[in-house]
């Protein structure tokens, strides 16, 4: 039996709560100092719930970066695709970036301050940095 829409929304809400808690932990401790215990405590879940959604703290870290960059890029794509003047497009891009930064300043700061030398096997968020 397929999950109901309500169940899907609840799972997504739990996952987002984990990511929000993890963001606080990573900002405070870095990836090296963060643990799944810290993330569980900050997000208000048990470790088993975290491991249901993520294999490791590196996976949580990667998900925050990938989702954050994806959100930024998807917000900017329509402006880039617009056929307006370069000057107006540039101004619209700056305004949109400022809006994103104001809406989630902690995430925005994290995305731009996350160490660039992270040695994770898979770094899917980098795709958004190089577009």
Regions found by a protein language model. Give the residues of each.
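Amphipathic alpha-helical packing segments from all-alpha helical-bundle domains
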Residues: 70-73, 77, 121-131
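Hydrophobic alpha-helical connector segments
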Residues: 63, 77-103
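Amphipathic alpha-helical segments used for helix-helix packing
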Residues: 101-123
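Residue-level detection of the helix-turn-helix DNA-binding "recognition helix"
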Residues: 41, 55-56, 66
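Basic, helix-initiating cap at the start of DNA-binding domains
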Residues: 1-29, 33-42, 59
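Short coil/turn segments at alpha/beta junctions that flank glycine-rich nucleotide-binding fingerprints
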Residues: 28-32, 83, 104
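Alpha-helical DNA-contacting segments of helix-turn-helix folds
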Residues: 61-68
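Short hydrophobic/aromatic patch on the recognition helix
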Residues: 44-54
């Amino acid at each position: 039996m397929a999950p109901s829409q309500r169940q899907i929304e609840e799972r997504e809400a739990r996952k987002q709560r984990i990511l929000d808690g993890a963001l606080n932990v990573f900002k405070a401790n870095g990836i090296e100092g963060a643990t799944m215990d810290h993330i569980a405590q900050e997000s208000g879940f048990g470790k088993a719930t975290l491991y249901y959604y993520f294999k490791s703290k590196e996976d949580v870290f990667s998900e925050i970066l990938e989702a954050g960059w994806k959100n930024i890029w998807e917000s900017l794509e329509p402006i880039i695709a617009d056929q307006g003047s370069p000057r107006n497009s540039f101004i619209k891009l700056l305004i949109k970036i400022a809006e994103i930064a104001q809406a989630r300043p902690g995430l925005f700061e994290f995305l731009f301050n996350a160490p660039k030398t992270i040695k994770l096997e898979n770094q899917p968020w980098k795709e958004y940095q190089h577009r």
